[in-house]
């Protein structure tokens, strides 16, 4: 397996290569094949750390950093010569050695070259740095989403302030375009529709769910060869309405943390979404059934940090919170009386809750900030500095790797175990034997 994670402490990233069964907390268990620092930039540190990291169509890795920086890296790996003593031995110790690298940065738009001081010990960086876009935001304005628009060959970067920038990565000389979301002043969640890239949903602290069309669906990347700015005028398609007052007749506060679009069994022109909140709720919206959520489930007493679908049918979700919860819930199977509380004025209060299908347990001791579901596996990482990989369905732990750094984002690059050299040699020999046999048969047929 290969997983790329961010390094909050250093502002860089780490590439981890390991097999199923790896566990750095046990000396006699399988250890990682590789843990290597990468994506170092000049003056990289905690204040310029990577918040979001995405795989852009197996062409680039794109990272949104604090301070308004969007960094572009080549997806292809360079062969990197490691000093033997710097390769992690994986003995389960928490003294994670910081590795050094020497990197020559080249900006393709200006052809300027800059030597970066040596901060670790490689001949070159694992992923070549290609370009850096600067977005005009304040240092305190945190990026809350990085989404790709394949049809436009672009990405969208959303910030807490409500600013959303469109960046065309097909031309590194492109000037990022600011998109003005009507009436939006604070964001904590931003999502693009997987099948309608011109449609987005957003929300945040006291910003209830809204759906907007950013541009006409007929627009594609050719627009950037023209006067394109007039083509991007966001308009609101849907505004959600808050749930009814609580049992004390008090207004329920709004604080959306994640948004997902449903794509299965949704009528054209209508939208169905699920959101999580800072107050531990899951809410499902269906625009054909009005502005209020059609379902409102309390699932946690602490803020929900991440939310992803757990299967292709979109009937399960995997979520994490600020404590140590990493769990899978069913959206089809509902426990009607799972949530019970008592109020002096209203008596017993009973609410339905999605069925807890199970927790992912592996000794997690802190908030999980990053997760990805990919090809039947799910990876988690966060404040306790461990990367954990599980089978989504069985929830069996497949690998546990100590990284030595806090993680905000991760990408599963490869879910398969790398074959060892002996296995690779055996396969090469078998292929050569097969080729030789077929070659001899061809010669006999010709005779």
From Swiss-Prot:
SUPFAM superfamilies: WD40 repeat-like (SSF50978). Residues 84-107 have a biased composition (Basic and acidic residues). Residues 83-114, 414-447 are annotated as: Disordered. It comes from Lodderomyces elongisporus (strain ATCC 11503 / CBS 2605 / JCM 1781 / NBRC 1676 / NRRL YB-4239) (Yeast). GO terms for biological process: ribosomal large subunit biogenesis; rRNA processing. This is Ribosome biogenesis protein NSA1. Keywords: Nucleus, Ribosome biogenesis, rRNA processing. Involved in the biogenesis of the 60S ribosomal subunit. The keyword Ligase does not apply. GO terms for cellular component: nucleolus; preribosome, large subunit precursor. Belongs to the NSA1 family. The keyword rRNA processing applies. InterPro entries: WD40/YVTN_repeat-like_dom_sf (IPR015943), WD40_repeat_dom_sf (IPR036322), WDR74/Nsa1 (IPR037379). It is found in: Nucleus, Nucleolus. Its main location: nucleus. Component of the pre-66S ribosomal particle.
